[in-house]
Amino acid sequence: MNIAVIGLSHKTAPVEVREKLSLPETEIQNAISELCSGTYTQEVGILSTCNRLEIYVVTNEMQPGIREVTQFLSESSKIPLNQLRPHLFMLLHEDSIMHLMRVASGLDSLVLGEGQILAQVKQTHKLGQKYKGIGRILNRLFKQAVTAGKRVRTETSIGTGAVSVSSAAVELAQMKLEDLSNYQVAIVGAGKMSKLLVQHLLAKGANKISIINRSVGRAQDLANSFKDANIKVYSMLEMVQVIGESDLVFTSTAATELILDKAKLETILDPLKPLMLVDISVPRNIGNDVSELPNVRCFNVDDLKAVVAQNRESRRQMAMEAEVLLEEEVEAFDVWWKSLETVPTINSLRQKIETIREQELEKALSRLGSEFAEKHQEVIEALTRGIVNKILHDPMVQLRAQQDIEARRHAMETLQLLFNLESEMSSGKVI
């Protein structure tokens, strides 16, 4: 079996490409089902965020397995493979393992050290299990990656004062507008990113904030979490009017289609009044053509790179601390991965010993008589099972823990010879 990751991110593809490959949670089940129906793909985990789509697979044949994934990506995005391929990255086994560890730790994020990605990796693991895409190998890998992410955030300084896409968006606005307290601000959307936007806007001095959302109740809940801020709430039906009265607008919704374009705005905007739009959604919420309107400036997530660059250098040294921890977690996974080679031998030995135990127990109970056997069978059963487990425990632990490949294989061959396991394994009795 081989592990691989195929995908694209803010490092390899512009937002125009990434948005075509953004998979909302509602589509993950079908995507996993389609990929798992392939001939060469045994396990699948799909990580989809605003800055990346990564498909982790366990495949029995590497090249055909990768081909199945790239074909799926091309068909899903409706981008011909020859045009999509330059934006894709592919990492195999050790490289794919380290990559997921770095992703979970925030070291591969647009905003170095951001914390939201760890929750997104956890959700990928959860959905992969729910929809039967993640099996034994990816289950262990994602658990190890989550452990790595937690360790990096608690044992290093990378998480201290870490910024997010939302905070970078507010920073960009402040760079362009300076004193945010002078501006009327609107936020379209009421999710986690919007909550962070409000938090950072208030910290920067903004005091005239409106939230626009499809569910007014959800927008009100968000406003209520900042009780002293006097935040106004509007429905999507009022969106265009509110934007027309605003100086700065952020969009952060899960909409898969554009919610703002030139046609919607040109009739309500004052051509003499400047308007700054910051779209942190993927797929994008705002069409490119709004920039054709007089006095309108529009930015998207790719425009945050300049802001992030200022923060990145000071955090690069912190990231080096984290890499040491990640090496430890990769090694821990690798030890487990290599131990899988011992599973057939261990299962075969356990099956053989269990068969002997059951046979000898049956003989003993028949000699003791039915009355005694019925009364004490459970105790004797537990006793014999306990003895077997105790005897097998240390040899099995030592066999799994043996990291030297030659030594481990020699130990397996010795066990197979001493217990005549070859015939057991070849006869299909292994469980």
Curated annotation (Swiss-Prot):
The keyword 4Fe-4S does not apply. The record marks 99 as: Important for activity. PROSITE patterns: GLUTR. Its EC number is 1.2.1.70. It catalyses: (S)-4-amino-5-oxopentanoate + tRNA(Glu) + NADP(+) = L-glutamyl-tRNA(Glu) + NADPH + H(+). It comes from the Bacteria. One of its GO terms (biological process) is chlorophyll biosynthetic process. Possesses an unusual extended V-shaped dimeric structure with each monomer consisting of three distinct domains arranged along a curved 'spinal' alpha-helix. The N-terminal catalytic domain specifically recognizes the glutamate moiety of the substrate. The second domain is the NADPH-binding domain, and the third C-terminal domain is responsible for dimerization. Catalyzes the NADPH-dependent reduction of glutamyl-tRNA(Glu) to glutamate 1-semialdehyde (GSA). Homodimer. This is Glutamyl-tRNA reductase.
